[in-house]
Amino acid sequence: MTFISQAPSVSISSAGPSDYFALLKPRVMSLVIFTALAGMLIAPDPVHPIVGFASLLAIAVGAGASGALNMWYDADIDAVMKRTAKRPIPLGRVMPNEALAFGLTLSFLSVFTLGIVANWLAAGFLAFTIFFYVVIYTMWLKRSTPQNIVIGGAAGAFPPMVGYAAATGHFSLSSFILFAIIFIWTPPHFWALALGRSEDYRQAGIPMMPNVKGAARTRLEILLYTLLLAPLGVAPWLLGFASFVYGMLSIALGAAMLFFAARVYIVQEGPSADRHAKALFGFSILYLFLLFAEIVVERLVPIVVAMGAWLTSGMFPGFFH
């Protein structure tokens, strides 16, 4: 007689590396790296390259962990929405329990690594950021209030403050200004997208602003937030931690952002209304990228030039003198 032991069945998928990489939300992770780098570079003293690289890696992993935990919890609504139906869990390529374990493991590793290579203030704030995104936004706000993206958007705005804290061991007004720019940018960015996908959100039961307050109210709030964003984007120059070039760029970009937002508010019906909302969504990405790219470039170029001069003079002292 053959005895077969009965054990609890555990769902295990045949997921590959690309599936787990998709759980990290790489597009969001790249934005986190970029904004955290900007926060790190505005620190008054330069951070050691190895410490800086390791800190950015830890912050990126923390952002990826948040994405994995978000997909684990939102698997039910991801399967309903067209935009998210092809994510690894709805497709059955990654089991929910695997995504949960993956996200929790990366969360611990990212926080612990940042604490070791930088400092525990930055690590603690990274842990808080993960908690805020997963628990406050994903588990609570997202399904309960049309202000979900307003309050929850703080999680996506924290990386510059984490980067600054990793470089200095404290926070500053300058890092908070970068946080505020992303925080105020988030509602018009996501509501412009939500205007064209309100039916998708309705089917998933997510109370986005267009579904709860209507398209007209959403368009008005997009304009109001953009009116706040335009002068706020100039603040780094006015406060002295960004250059004149940044100041002129931020003024031009702010004016363009206002133009796109005003069109969304004025044209509320017909094919042009949807087209203007999509245009605002696309430009908002360019707006944030160019603002932070200018900060990164103007801080990195002197560092790269100085390192190049040091390397060439050290390696070929006779040739360059």
From Swiss-Prot:
Listed transmembrane segments: 28-48, 49-69, 94-114, 116-136, 149-169, 176-196, 222-242, 247-267, 277-297, 300-320
Annotated gene: ctaB
CDD domains per UniProt: PT_UbiA_Cox10
Lineage, uppermost ranks: Bacteria, Pseudomonadati, Pseudomonadota, Alphaproteobacteria, Hyphomicrobiales
Entry's EC annotation: 2.5.1.141
Record flagged with keyword Transferase: yes
Pfam families hit by this protein: UbiA
Principal EC category: transferase
Keywords: Cell inner membrane, Cell membrane, Heme biosynthesis, Membrane, Transferase, Transmembrane, Transmembrane helix
Membrane topology according to the record: Multi-pass membrane protein
Function: Converts heme B (protoheme IX) to heme O by substitution of the vinyl group on carbon 2 of heme B porphyrin ring with a hydroxyethyl farnesyl side group.
Origin: domain of life: Bacteria
Pathway membership, UniProt: Porphyrin-containing compound metabolism; heme O biosynthesis; heme O from protoheme: step 1/1
Catalysis: reaction(s): heme b + (2E,6E)-farnesyl diphosphate + H2O = Fe(II)-heme o + diphosphate
InterPro entries named in the record: Protohaem_IX_farnesylTrfase, UbiA_prenyltransferase, UbiA_prenylTrfase_CS, UbiA_sf
Family to which this protein belongs: Belongs to the UbiA prenyltransferase family. Protoheme IX farnesyltransferase subfamily.
The name this protein goes by in its record: Protoheme IX farnesyltransferase
Location in the cell: Cell inner membrane
Molecular function as annotated in GO: protoheme IX farnesyltransferase activity
Further facts: Carbon 2 of the heme B porphyrin ring is defined according to the Fischer nomenclature.
HAMAP family with a match to the protein in the record: CyoE_CtaB
GO biological process: heme O biosynthetic process
Gene Ontology CC terms: plasma membrane
